[in-house]
Amino acid sequence: MNGLNHNALTCSAVPIPPWERSLQTVEAQPYFNVSQASLVLEGIVFDRNNNLLFVDVATGRVFKLTPERQLSIVLKENSFGASGLAVHKDGRIFIASVGDMQRGSVRAIEPNGTREQMIVAPDTGFLVNDLVFDNQGGFYFTDSRGNSADPQGGVFYVSPNVGSIHAILPGLAVGNGIAIDPVGSQIWATEHAKNRLHRVRLSDATTVAPFG
């Protein structure tokens, strides 16, 4: 009796599904070696000068890599931790943090790492994982609270004047990554504990569109 026949496409521990094998692909290549140590790097975003910014999750450090591939540390001391970055239209760097997994925050620093300002304080109770700005200067962030059986997280919006926080997509099981389209009419957010990607259509910055 003949056994099952496998090839390079099917013998992997995580084979590519048949309906995805004909999609166009590109293989990623190493770009820059940040460290010989094993670091968890996240929050990749470009600033206004085409520098690549990212964080070391374990230490909360914020790195900058120039187009010439010169690496420097923008923020060396960060007891709050870091999990995501976004750049305000005025150039400030906003840092998302889950903190000690009990009290997260959003803080802003100048491009050179100085003048730290608290935007979303730890006592608000959010575990801020990631964030993204809209065209008005407000930002959406994901909240990583909860688990698959107790979805306490979600997507929230902070107004441009940082005067209020609005719930946009509550009830997520560990909100994670977030992105927005160029005109601010749709956001995408991942729900880590349930392996879901949500697309949300918006009527305005704080209102989900009908059937959105």
Positions of predicted regions on the chain:
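A short helix->beta-strand "capping" segment at the edge of beta-propeller domains
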Residues: C11-S38, P67-R69
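A short beta-strand motif characteristic of beta-propeller blades
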Residues: E27-V34, R69-K76, T114-P122, G163-P170, ...
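Beta-rich, blade/repeat-based domains predominating
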Residues: V34-N49, E77-S105, P122-F141, G146-N147, ...
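Beta-propeller domains
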Residues: N49-E77
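A short loop-to-beta-strand structural motif that recurs across blades of beta-propeller domains
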Residues: R61-F63, G104-R107, G153-F156, R196-H198
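Short loop/turn segments that connect beta-strands within beta-propeller blades
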Residues: L65-Q70, I109-T114, S159-G163, R201-T206
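A short, charged helix-loop
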Residues: G153-A167
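Anionic-ligand binding region
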Residues: A193-G212
